[in-house]
């Protein structure tokens, strides 16, 4: 299980600005298949939507975001009715290249499962805004996938913004989200509809 506690540090700058944050954990391979991981992410969004009014949250201002594999999941759940928009940081949008990598040693995906769970092949039906970010110092494949996914959304008439954070790599890009003046932080605030 990817622990939500590992990412609690990301919430601090938003909480200090009066923005509520829900951190979601999810199972990892080999304990779950990619289909199960994506289904779990959908279930988490539905649970949050049901509980949010009880917690005093505004159900019209729910934005899903994620980093790396969480960035992949954020795009896979974007059709959930309760979501206003999405933001993906350093996500993976085409899973077929993973089939021959060490990552698939734990995921055990076949070609059909990779296709079902590749955002670039499963564009959402809704026209919710999605902001995509990658670091300029990310691996070329990560940057290519992000740029290709942005292009696919544009070609389908879906709203998308794509930006590369100068000098950021797969890990340091999170500093841009934590910093109130960072482009990613500001984009998330804008997707929420302002403070």
Where are these regions (language model features)?
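Alpha/beta-hydrolase superfamily serine-hydrolase fold, recognizing
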Residues: 1-195
């Amino acid at each position: 299980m990817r622990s939500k506690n590992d990412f609690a540090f990301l919430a601090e700058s938003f909480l200090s600005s009066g923005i509520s944050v829900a951190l979601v954990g999810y199972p990892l391979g080999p304990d779950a298949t990619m289909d199960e991981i994506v289904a779990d992410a959908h279930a988490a969004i539905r649970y949050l939507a049901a509980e949010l009014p009880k917690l005093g949250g505004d159900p019209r201002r729910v934005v899903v975001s994620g980093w790396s594999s969480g960035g992949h999941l954020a795009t896979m759940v974007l059709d959930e009715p309760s979501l206003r928009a999405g933001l993906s940081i350093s996500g993976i949008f085409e899973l077929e290249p993973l089939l021959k990598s060490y990552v698939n040693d734990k995921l055990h995906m076949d070609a059909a499962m990779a296709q079902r769970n590749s955002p670039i092949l499963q564009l959402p039906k809704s026209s919710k805004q999605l902001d995509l970010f990658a670091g300029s110092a990310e691996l070329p494949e990560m940057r290519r996938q992000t740029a290709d996914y942005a292009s696919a959304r544009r070609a389908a008439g879906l709203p998308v913004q794509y930006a590369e954070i100068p000098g950021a790599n797969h890990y340091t890009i999170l500093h841009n989200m934590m910093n109130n003046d960072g482009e990613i932080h500001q984009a998330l605030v804008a997707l929420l509809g302002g403070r």
